Amino acid sequence: MKANSRKNIAILSLTLAVVMLGFGMVMPIFPFYIESMGARGSELGLLIAISPFMQLLFAPIWGSVSDRKGRKPVLAVGLLGYGISMLLFGLATELWMLFVARGVGAILSAATMPTTMAYVSDSTSEQDRGGGIGVLGAATGLGMVLGPALGGWLAVDSLSTPFFITAGVCLLTLLLVVLFLPESLPAEARRSTATQIKPAAQLGEMWRALSSRPLGILLTMAFLVSFGLTCFQGIFGLYALERFGYGTEEVGWILAVVGIVAALTQGVLTGPLTKRWGEAAVIKVTLLGSAVAFVLLLTANTLPAVLLTIALFTVPNALLRPAVISLTSKRADTEQGVAMGLNNSFNSLGRIAGPIWAGFVFDVDYRLPYLSGAAILVAGFVISLMWLPGQEETAGVGVRSRV
């Protein structure tokens, strides 16, 4: 990889790390922030769900805009908007201001991921592209791991401090992008017209895909993976506050442990386990394991026990998503892009539904998010036993032919 490409990828990696650091930092803070404004679980769930909802809507739009206007201006807009949203969070004194800040940040930060990936595709050879995307993935993971711990620690004295710091880092990163990152898409290579984004057609395709097998079952699994994880993460701060009296620092470290365990699990265990047992078997076992861990979490009474049960939940959940993605890819040997797009859409739906559901049932009883989450994962396990083919059935067919 050329020196200029390495420099550009370093700037892009910093951009993604900053954005994901911001997302990670707010997770342990939100529960305490909204409680100080008199809100509870239902408001927290809706606040968290805004981000994946806006990303689902606006990421394709930003990708289309970058094809016409270039990558650099879209990336700059995303960083500027995200920095402003963090500043608004820090200045918020009422609940509605949090929702406005979250919405603005989600809409504009949705530009960063598709644009950085497109930048790498523009500026690297096919041989170097995988390495470049891998570096961006590592930066994303680093931001998500460090964010909760850093946010929880910075919020000990003031809940606003992490937001102001993130806003400042965003603006510094914006300067790096504006001053040192060249445009990767020449004017002659840009589209003259916008790509048509048709949400109704996308929803129709998602509905048709659900009726096919095994694709529909795998898409259901993709939904359940995200639903289970966000059901846990979204409400955990309020659960920890009500059950144990934990503050932002303890919640931040616990969520950081989730990120570390997930990264180690996916890096070390996913390959050997799926190679040995096959993706279908891994999906079935991890669905049941995640459900059991949800119930065990309710029995934990000390910090070591909480960490242990959360690790027991994180390991199978971390194995589940790559197994679902891999099996979806194998069962769609043609039209891979359609299959992966559907997988991402159902993943986003799970990230929207999980925190909303957890927040509303938390207001009924603080144990219900995890009990209901366990029940839903058990239902997924039963569905996988009945309808998910085993490893020996590997023949793939085109996605559209089945939907």
Question: How should these model regions be labeled?
Answer:
Residues 28-42, 235-250:
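Short amphipathic helix-loop junctions that connect adjacent transmembrane helices
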Residues 136-179:
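Helix-loop-helix hairpin linking two adjacent transmembrane segments in secondary transporters
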Residues 38, 70, 91-97, 108, ...:
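Helix-breaking motifs and short loop linkers at transmembrane-helix boundaries and internal kinks
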Residues 101-142:
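Cytoplasmic helix-loop-helix junction between adjacent transmembrane helices
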Residues 1-5, 182-219, 402-403:
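Juxtamembrane intracellular "pre-TM" segments in multi-pass secondary transporters
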Residues 59-69, 265-279, 362:
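Helix-to-loop junctions at the C-terminal end of transmembrane segments
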